[in-house]
Swiss-Prot record:
HAMAP family: Rel_fac_1. One of its GO terms (molecular function) is translation release factor activity, codon specific. This is Peptide chain release factor 1. Residues 293-308 have a biased composition (Basic and acidic residues). Its main location: cytoplasm. Methylated by PrmC. Methylation increases the termination efficiency of RF1. The gene is prfA. Keywords: Cytoplasm, Methylation, Protein biosynthesis. One of its GO terms (cellular component) is cytoplasm. It comes from Streptococcus uberis (strain ATCC BAA-854 / 0140J). The keyword NADP does not apply.
Amino acid sequence: MNIYDQLQSLEDRYEELGELLSDPEVVSDTKRFMELSKEEANTRETVATYRQYKDIIQSISDAEEMIKESGGDPEIEEMAKEELKESKVAKEDYEEKLKILLLPKDPNDDKNIILEIRGAAGGDEAALFAGDLLDMYQRFAESQGWRFEVMEASYNGVGGIKEVVAMVSGQSVYSKLKYESGAHRVQRVPVTESQGRVHTSTATVLVMPEIEDVEYDIDPKDLRIDIYHASGAGGQNVNKVATAVRIVHLPTNIKVEMQEERTQQKNRDKAMKIIRARVADHFAQIAQDEQDAERKSTIGTGDRSERIRTYNFPQNRVTDHRIGLTLQKLDTILSGKMDEVIDALVMYDQTQKLETLNQ
């Protein structure tokens, strides 16, 4: 099946979905209605672009016909030639858009994410920068209409973040934030620096798709679950009832502790969400490392310690090293307006995948 047959088939299916979604029998079946609604939403942009493409093809045909029937009228012929020229340029643009829209979708793109940020090299300054990154992602989430929930956090003495785990929920969260995993470097003058010297610090970010229990089954025998009393500042026990939960995945020694909630069950549920995502991510990374060709077709090397971006405060500059993008908009980006960076990463990734398909 060539690309045009594929697009026509997709348009036929889209029209069929429209009829199904207005069928009372389907509407009464909540599960099926939701599945079909999702399929319809996922094909909507491709079908709309294909219909615009067909309009362009018709414009080319009309312009060519007008030239033939101009009867030598130079004004009509010139107008038709100009329209033909513009339509041919638009045709090429739409063909590229359609190729990108037909690229195989990442099955995780529609998922919520678990976001982890840690202060790394640089002590207090790294922890403060980790807090800046948390604020940036939280503001970006708000601008997208997503829900941002801090699930677990530990702070240092100067208000910085040692480690934070957050759940980001909404439409296509993973598709936009999946490129954020890696080491983020900051260059700035710390508030404690009396000589005005620029210091370099690092925070690491990990983005994992939320994994439902039906998608990834962890054998209960592989888990050790400990229950203990939650502790507050200074280490004192804050609950008379043991509500804090520690879960260890024994085969990988991945550990999650949760004490943010007031009940043991809520802490356990949140801890399971995190450990399921971490264990799935652990084995996904192993599989990815074994597939060199696949890794080359994605942004970066896949190494979680890879430096992906530098934030230079004195120059108000952000540089994404994977795609060579430099923007003099650090203040804007840290305020949560990340669209320009994310759009560039998405476009680069799509271009790389297209080149791989065309080889």
